[in-house]
Curated annotation (Swiss-Prot):
Residues 78-93 have a biased composition (Gly residues). It holds the Pfam family RRM_1. Residues 3-76 form the RRM domain. This is Probable splicing factor, arginine/serine-rich 6. Gene3D superfamilies: 3.30.70.330. Residues 161-173 have a biased composition (Basic residues).
Amino acid sequence: MDAKVYVGGLPSDATSQELEEIFDRFGRIRKVWVARRPPGFAFVEYDDVRDAEDAVRALDGSRICGVRARVELSTGQRRGGGGRGGGFGGRGGGGRDRSPYRGDRGRSRSRSRDRGRDRSRDRSRDRSRDRSRDRSRERSRERERTRSRSRSPQERDRSHSKSRSRSRSRSRSRSASPH
């Protein structure tokens, strides 16, 4: 297993020194690489895979270089889409865009290895999948909010005037009938 950690959502001015200071408390670091084009992600490689797993558990979702960062174990496979997130292969967050067949083939191989380590990896994968699901829910809620706000004043007036005239005609017909 690869002892490489993907760090995503970083600001463009993040440095390898900053990352090394944050990540070295989990074990000996072999290499830190910060992407420049496009910026926003990095890889931290440890000597020992257990150190990488500890770093992921402790730092995923925490503030790194002033922003809330995503920290995941890297699978070493590049993913399409402009290079952002390349190298982590959708291990947790991007599970829904993978074919279920491909995922099963890779998973069955790892099942035959050490069960305890696999179980903790499954748990962290589930947690990150839940987090990404929550994030996408928040995003769609935000889109709905901005959509309703972005209606033009004329459109808003039109919908109000329709309901106003409807209620006026109803109240008029009620008052005309004798009680």
